[in-house]
């Protein structure tokens, strides 16, 4: 009898243990796997007391969201921290994550068939902290991830998530072994802003300070460290011209010995002169945001770019420090004295003609914010003659500083901020004779 009772008790204990294991396993949903990073391999995700736990987790088809113990089980009821609101709208977060994921994967093509993201969910780690910095990247060079605190994700649009998830997708290229992505650099920040701008076309309004800052610094070289968060406009131009997937292709093609401009030229077999033509076309369009995706919504920003000029006896020169650098640009408004009149200007380069080249031309803008463009010019000493459209209300001269003959990125990869001990970026000085 005792032996029979012992067997029954062992059976019941085994059943309880088995059910407990099944209960723990049921916390992990079906579908894509949840990757456990190396740094957490010793942690017990089944234990609700652990820093990261299946008991404080939410999943979608493509994401797993973990949150720290301090939030409690329900993010909508998270206790304040030092008097600060720590609540998170989890439903909105999950919804936005999937919306952004679909664009970055299916339209922008940052991941290709065979990606590790087909096996694993991307990871979002919510820190119970007042630290305002958010990060996007990957775990163990396996799967894209991002780390964020509540104060960055309490708005409905979740611009921060759109930006940081952009970094997660950029990192996934390295995780999947499909490209080197130059080994890093400011292009990552510019691209995340471009990705954000695609999923939220009102980014330039919501975070208008970026546009305001760029309007003070657009003379600086392309991908200057001061502008990488402010100016995704060249990337918008490239995607308009080459297709939405071109930026991901650029990341895959970029080698550690290159910079993005060199990679782009290589991808499309462009000479420096041809690339300079494209950069002028891009910047002349930027006067009215003449890019199909945002043209209508951005008419309100038409004609806002302006370069400080010194004007003396009909000779205009950029104010000290404002001459364009390599693939930076200037914008100068030319007075219209009579509608439909013929405008005559003379351009004179004032830099070393063996090294400096220019692209320049005119942009006429009507009251509705529509633009008409003159032919672009590249002469070092050139005369401009242009008959104004009858409906033109404003006229802008646009000039781009370009390398001559050969493009050499300035500094350690053109897209990195320059160190204090490095020589300054070259300026492309010029004179504009206004008649």
Role assignments for model-derived ranges:
Residues 1-25:
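Bacterial Sec-dependent N-terminal signal peptides
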Residues 2-3, 54-57, 113-117, 388:
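A general structural signal for short secondary-structure junctions and capping/turn motifs
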Residues 23-95, 99, 355-358, 383, ...:
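Zymogen propeptides/activation segments of proteases
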Residues 52-54, 113, 135-136, 224:
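Catalytic micro-motifs at enzyme active sites that drive phosphoryl/nucleotidyl and oxygen chemistry
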Residues 60-184, 188-192, 202-203:
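Juxtacatalytic substrate-recognition/specificity segment
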Residues 136-139, 155-160, 175-246, 251-290:
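Acidic/His/Gly-enriched intrinsically disordered linker/tail segments
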